[in-house]
Amino acid sequence: MSYQSILLRQVNSLCDNLEEVARDENGGLIDMAMQSDYFTFDVMSEVIFGMAYNALKDTSYRFVTGALGSSNIRIGTLVQSPLPAMCRIDKYLFPESIQGRNKFLGFIGSLLRDRSKASFAGNGNVFSFLETAKDPDGGNQLSKSEIRAECATLVAAGTDTSSSTLAATLFYLSRNSKCYSRVSEEVRNAFSSHQDIKIGPELNSCVYLRACIEETLRMSPPVGAALWREIGPGGMNIGPLTLPAGVDVGTGIYSLHHNAAYHPEPFKYLPERWLVGEGSSTSESVELARSAFAPFSRGPRSCVGKGFAYHELTLTIAHILHRFDFSATEEDFALRHGSEGPGGINEFLLHDHVTGARSGPLLQFSMRR
């Protein structure tokens, strides 16, 4: 696994931060939204671009995650309705978001300049392939503007989605003690030391850990809105409807994931729903649930990084569970009071800014007992 060494190095860096807090005699409270952002930014920048920005330890590039989050407020609106941009009123509605976008694009420019200072050819990161890729039909390579646009997409996709799912999984485990106890026991029994936790059969055997991650993706999908697609020539039949070419169609992923016809008790965190033979789960019920489960979208436009995201999440959460104990805090309950989603105060609420904007969780960490 070519990226495993990078993942393990960054996981250890994240756990070093958590250990510093966990050993603090004044209390081990930490904002996992911020730590998750810095962690996934560091992983993304090294795996995709071959650059080490070290946001977990160095404050110099932490502004990027904030700028991206601010930029996405405007972008999330325009994805659902491009009219404000057509009328040029978005600059009056979202001045701070546009400033964030400019900061973010400034970082993209600096990233490309940093790469140009040294040769990265053949080092195996994703971007090195993108730079040299050729159209199999015409032999053309991507232009500088196209590479810049791909950069922006890769940074956003590689940072925000995994960050929100990591934070959300820890949130749900901290609020569901039975799930937390079971998954902790599973991981700690599978590995005698956190240094043994690597991608492979032993980690794959932690099926309840995978179920916890999938239940998090169902409850709080990192991209929860409809991803619109235009119907091509000839139109399309969808159920009893015949829709003409040119019509945009989409399914709201959050709504799909909370449809009780596919996911009974949709606002309850129940990892067992993904495991045949657990509780009331049967092969038929699990198959039905998976038919309405699309956190990475589906088809030819589904997320190309799905496999990597699962590796990143399982590896990271396994290390955290093996090394630490953590719990919900009064501060986190206070943070969510008055801003509950449909699932109440025990739902990790995400705001639709293309990817999910979030707060916390604020968790109490201690060294594993």
UniProtKB/Swiss-Prot annotation:
What residues bind heme, as annotated? C303
Keyword Cell inner membrane attached? no
Query: How has the protein been applied in practice?
Result: Apicidin F, like the other known apicidins, is a cyclic tetrapeptides with anti-malarial properties via histone deacetylase inhibitory activity.
Top-level division of the source organism's lineage: Eukaryota
State the function annotated in the UniProt record.
Cytochrome P450 monooxygenase; part of the gene cluster that mediates the biosynthesis of the cyclic tetrapeptide apicidin F (APF). The non-ribosomal peptide synthetase apf1 incorporates four different amino acids to produce apicidin F: L-phenylalanine, D-pipecolic acid (D-pip), N-methoxy-L-tryptophan and L-2-aminooctanedioic acid. L-Phenylalanine is the only proteinogenic amino acid directly used by apf1. The 3 other apf1 substrates are non-proteinogenic and have to be modified by other enzymes of the cluster.
Under the heading InterPro entries, the entry gives: Cyt_P450 (IPR001128), Cyt_P450_CS (IPR017972), Cyt_P450_E_grp-I (IPR002401), Cyt_P450_sf (IPR036396), Cytochrome_P450_monoxygenase (IPR050121)
Annotated EC: 1.-.-.-
Q: Which GO terms describe its molecular function?
A: heme binding; iron ion binding; monooxygenase activity; oxidoreductase activity, acting on paired donors, with incorporation or reduction of molecular oxygen
Among PROSITE patterns, the record links this protein to: CYTOCHROME_P450
Q: List cofactor names only.
A: heme
- Give the protein family: Belongs to the cytochrome P450 family.
Q: Under which name does UniProt file this protein? A: Cytochrome P450 monooxygenase apf8
**What induces this one?**
Expression is positively regulated by the apicidin F cluster-specific transcription factor apf2 that binds to the eight-base-pair motif 5'-TGACGTGA-3' called the 'Api-box' that is found in all promoters of the apicidin F cluster except in the promoter region of apf2 itself.
Record key words, sorted: Heme, Iron, Metal-binding, Monooxygenase, Oxidoreductase
One Pfam family hit: p450
Signal peptide segment: none
Metabolic or biological pathway: Secondary metabolite biosynthesis
